[in-house]
Amino acid sequence: MTQYDPTNSRPVIALMTDFGIGDGDVGVMKGVIASITPDVHIIDITHHVAPQNVPSGAWILASAYRYFPKNTVYVCVVDPGVGSSRRAIALHAGDWFFVGPDNGLFSYILAEQPVRATVLLSNPTYHLPHVSSTFHGRDIFAPVGAHLARGLTRTFAELGTSIDPATLQRLEIALTSRRGTDIDAHIVHVDNFGNLITSIPSDMVPELFTAPQVQIIFPQQGVVVEKRRRFFAEGHEDGQAFIYSDSSGYIGIAVRNGNAARTLGVGVGAAITLVTAAK
């Protein structure tokens, strides 16, 4: 039997945008990529990030990137600042490469992976000949991603000027901070079911289901959630919110057979405090 040889595998580009699929923008980006690197395997993470919602896009990327092969190139476009002074960047972090705007979209990557190199995409050789002020996904990010998938580390240094990763934009919403046993964080994503995803990694609270009492408090809304469930079917009280560990690896809040965002009246950006205490 022929054994799989990962060194002979096709290059992989993963796309994530807020473009939707009603227009031709996603198809055009794929066409640009295929024109440069015809053998590339293009995988869509999603094209339905809420429009201009950088925090949601950052979280979706964070929940997905670990499940792709090493050396995958992520081309990510949630870019409300396109055409402005915001920087176009590529970074080599962990075992993967990321291409997109410097607007906080890579906040979780920067927090979770060692950054090996970062470049400003200043070399026009790797762009399309004519760069629009409104479609950098087509004119800069797609061609850069395609060239990068062909050459990876060899090409990376040629993409532009090296920049200090400490200068990259990071979303405050993606940060967590401890105060004793309390954790201050935010809601960073609302999924299709209305579940509220927090910026707190589940492994940050190993006692989530063993501590005598755990609460998530929304101080601005005066809302407290303290029921905990290991899985959705265990949440037998329809209409009541409970805390759970989401499959993405982050702590979430759900309502069985309901919508937590609507039930609690909160959404992306809401401040929370997770409190662990003995009764």
How would you describe each model-predicted region?
Residues 19-23, 81-83, 193-195, 258-260:
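Short acidic, Gly/Ser-rich segments with clustered Asp/Glu that frequently serve as metal-coordination loops
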Residues 128-209:
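Anionic-ligand-binding alpha/beta catalytic cores of soluble enzymes and soluble regulatory domains
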Residues 199-248:
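A C-terminal functional module that forms or caps the active site or interfaces directly
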Residues 11-12, 36-42, 53-59, 69-78, ...:
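Active-site histidine-anchored catalytic micro-motif
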Residues 71, 211-213, 239-240, 267-271:
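Loop/turn positions that initiate beta-strands
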Residues 2-6, 10-51:
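N-terminal glycine-rich anion-binding loop in soluble enzyme alpha/beta folds
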Residues 249-279:
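Generic C-terminus detector
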